[in-house]
Curated annotation (Swiss-Prot):
Family label: Belongs to the polyribonucleotide nucleotidyltransferase family.
Name of the gene this protein is made from: pnp
Magnesium is among the record's keywords: yes
Catalytic activity: RNA(n+1) + phosphate = RNA(n) + a ribonucleoside 5'-diphosphate
Primary subcellular site in the record, as a coarse category: cytoplasm
Phylogenetic classification of the source organism: Bacteria, Bacillati, Bacillota, Clostridia, Eubacteriales
Residues that coordinate or bind Mg(2+): 485, 491
UniProt keyword annotations, A-Z: Cytoplasm, Magnesium, Metal-binding, Nucleotidyltransferase, RNA-binding, Transferase
UniProt-listed Gene3D superfamilies: GHMP Kinase, N-terminal domain (3.30.230.70), K Homology domain, type 1 (3.30.1370.10), Nucleic acid-binding proteins (2.40.50.140)
Protein name, per record: Polyribonucleotide nucleotidyltransferase
E.C. numbers: 2.7.7.8
Domain KH: residue ranges: 552-611
Function: Involved in mRNA degradation. Catalyzes the phosphorolysis of single-stranded polyribonucleotides processively in the 3'- to 5'-direction.
UniProt domain S1 motif: residue ranges: 621-689
One GO MF term: 3'-5'-RNA exonuclease activity
Length: 702
């Protein structure tokens, strides 16, 4: 049976259909917002997966190019691997949902959101989060807490709910808020240096607007939701938990109180070895349960240290940032390099400048078709002292790269001001927490070292949270290290400048964040950010005055759009000759803006001169130095500008009578000529006689 339910959100219809499609899925819904439509299917395995200590949730965000009326480019005319944006959207769906499943639930769960229709005014990634929550709530899977997602824009001082395409262009803020009835589950934001109080108010606005969508989901569940299955939840057997606690708790507590990371890890390795030796014969089939019990006790000790003893694992104050180190200019041949160190976290970012032709072309369902500034993040195994095969970037690397990219995007100079494609690559050399925000700092250093005139330096910091089990006690931590991230409840990343916030990303492991935690995290991040920015400015106070000598040389010129065809020529003949003769790269925009770049400045100058000649208009009354291209009985043809020839009649060749043209000029001669007339057919009439006369008069006056 087909069930439908509908509501209005921000003046546009939101509708869910259940029971019509995907009959063999546990739940399959078609959810629409305006003309944007997402097909969402959710399924779970019948039995828990054995031998694991995590919840195996898989979220897939599938883009279909037919949703925007496109056929995939390239030789193979079908969708390939997910785009970076699809991967990021899949992560954004996963993050608010994962903490809301029952603790100990180990069944495989798969959520597949397929984008089947897109209207640019209504973003599919926002609808997909709502659709995933709706499908899970309607299914028999034990997920019972609806999650809603909205986007918040800011135009002037007004917050806009789910802004349209035009409003997004005008908005200085792109904020996604995911929430339950009680708390905020996830935040993603990019902004043009948004003040802290404005950001907090925007998050509150988004939280309030989520409530209408939560109500919509609850109504649908009450009307046609499936009965929930009773889950088989994994729990460490009480006998094992008590035995491990009695044997090892004091040793674990003593080890976790060691402030030095390496000494603490070595001590814990010894404790784990003793635990294994003690219990592997008695409980040979329960070693994973023993490992889980040890993890729970480590977490318990860390929470007690922070909430009851007021101590951090490394001895810092709750609002203290680790030691900062900044360095630029490390590599001799790169265009810009920044090395940023925060405690045991270290990132080296390298900036490369390229021609405008090297922009990244995007073949996806979004409105953005190309990208001039990009940031890539690499996290090799050696950064944590491990041995693993080197693979391509995973979801985490793509997500961290995009986060650092978003943090600096509002600060990158315009194409007109700085005609380069900019690529940043952050190499994580050592990781002990918050490498994505270290990448923001490293990127700032590299851009300044490369001579990129960014609006202002940016820095990033990760804030953490430790709570009691009943959430009545909360402590916000500044600059969390790996241990606090691993055992903590929140990763609240904030990047920005001294003027305001440029990006936020928030993940939580608990059932949401209170308003107080969000406020304290945002203002705590500002205090830390300003301190880090001071360190960056001490290292390099402003962008280099010139780009690296190894960077391409570029020049821009504006031509009449009607003249573009003259520069390109039939079949690209003219532009290809310029490129071949000068060794440059040429990019021409529709508005007539021309970018010329090359490794050598001489080639750029020569190409610019040729293009100016091709596009310059011949004017009557002007004198030109032209080249004789052809001789006829009645006169000489002279090229006054590239591809622009005129005729000097034999009677206009000299002050005296000329019998033969060859007596005065030969092919290849350069002569001064004056344009006497451009007739109605565009023919150019020239006079050498008039040019000589004017030159003689000027000499007399001098």
């Amino acid at each position: 049976m087909n069930h439908t339910h509908e509501t209005i959100i921000a003046g546009r219809p939101m509708k869910v259909e259940f029971g019509k499609l995907g009959m063999l899925s546990d739940a399959a819904i078609l959810m629409s917002y305006g003309d944007t439509v997402i097909l969402t299917n959710v399924n779970a395995s019948e039995k828990p997966r054995e031998g694991i200590d995590f919840f195996p949730l898989s979220v897939e965000y599938e883009e279909r190019l037919y949703s925007v009326g496109k056929i995939p480019g390239g030789f193979i005319k079908r969708e390939g691997k997910p785009s970076e944006k699809a991967i990021l959207n899949g992560r954004a769906i996963d993050r608010p949902l994962r903490p809301l499943f029952p603790k100990g639930y180990r069944n495989d769960v798969q959520v597949v959101c397929t984008v089947v229709s897109v209207e640019n005014d209504n973003l599919p990634e926002i609808l997909a989060i709502n659709a995933a929550s709706m499908a899970l709530c309607l299914s028999s899977i034990p997920f019972t807490t609806p999650v809603a997602a909205v986007q918040v824009g800011l135009i002037g001082e007004e917050f806009i709910l789910n802004p349209t395409s035009k409003e997004r262009e005008e908005s200085s803020l792109q904020l996604t808020v995911c929430a339950t009835k009680e708390r905020v589950m996830m935040i993603e934001a990019g902004g043009d240096e948004i003040p802290e109080d404005t950001m907090i108010n925007a998050i509150k606005f988004g939280f309030d607007k989520c409530q209408d969508i939560i109500k919509f989901q609850e109504e649908a569940v009450s009307m046609f939701g499936k009965e929930k299955k009773v889950p088989e939840l994994h729990k460490v057997p009480e006998e094992i938990e008590e035995a491990v606690r009695e044997f090892a708790f004091d040793m674990i507590s003593e080890s976790m109180h060691i402030t030095d990371r390496d000494e603490r890890n070595a001590a814990m390795d010894e404790v784990k070895a003793k635990i294994n030796e003690e219990f592997e014969e008695k409980y040979p089939d329960n070693m994973s349960d023993i490992g889980e019990a040890v993890y729970d006790m480590q977490k318990e000790v860390v929470r007690h240290m922070l909430l009851k003893e007021g101590k951090r694992p490394d001895g810092r104050a709750f609002d203290e940032v680790r030691n900062i180190g900044c360095e630029v200019g490390l590599l001799p041949r790169t265009h810009g390099t920044g090395l940023f160190t925060r405690g045991l976290t270290q990132v080296m970012t390298v900036a490369t400048l390229g021609s405008i032709s090297e922009i990244q072309i995007l073949d996806g369902i979004g409105e953005e078709e190309s990208k001039r500034y990009m940031h890539h993040y690499n996290f090799p195994a050696y950064s944590v002292g491990e041995v693993r095969p080197l693979r391509g970037p995973g979801r985490r690397e793509i997500g961290h790269g995009a986060l650092a990219e978003r943090a600096l995007e509002p600060l990158i100079p315009s194409e007109a001001k700085f005609p380069y494609t900019i690529r940043l690559v952050s190499e994580v050399l050592s990781s002990n927490g918050s490498t994505s925000q270290a990448s923001v700092c490293g990127s700032t250093l590299a851009l300044l070292d490369a001579g990129v005139p960014i609006k202002r330096p940016a820095a990033g910091i990760a804030m953490g949270l430790i709570t009691s089990k009943d959430l009545t006690e909360e402590e916000v931590l500044t600059d969390i290290q790996g241990l606090e991230d691993f055992f903590g409840d929140m990763d609240f990343k904030v990047a920005g400048t001294e003027e305001g916030i440029t990006s936020i990303q928030v993940d939580t492991k608990i059932k949401g964040l209170s308003e107080k935690v969000i406020h304290d995290a945002i203002y705590g991040a500002r205090k830390a950010r300003l301190m880090i920015l001071d360190k960056i400015k001490e290292c390099i106070p402003a962008p280099r005055e010139e780009v690296s000598k190894y960077a391409p040389k570029t020049s821009t010129l504006q031509i009449d759009p009607e003249k573009i065809r003259d520069v390109i020529g039939a079949g690209g003949k003219v532009i290809n000759k310029i490129i071949a003769d000068t060794g440059v790269k040429i990019d021409i925009k529709e508005d007539g803006l021309v970018y010329v770049s090359s490794a050598e400045s001489e080639g750029v100058k020569e190409a610019v001169k040729i293009i100016e000649g091709l596009t310059k208009e011949v004017k009557a009354g002007e004198i030109y130095l032209g080249k004789v291209t052809k001789i006829a009985q009645f006169g000489a043809f002279v090229e006054v500008l590239p591809n622009k020839e005129g005729l000097v009649h034999i009677s206009k060749l000299d002050n005296k009578r000329v019998e033969k043209v060859e007596d005065v000029v030969s092919v290849g001669d350069e002569i001064l000529v004056k344009v006497t007339e451009i007739d109605s057919q565009g023919r150019i009439n020239l006079s050498r006689k008039d040019a000589i006369k004017e030159a003689e008069e000027e000499n007399k006056q001098q």
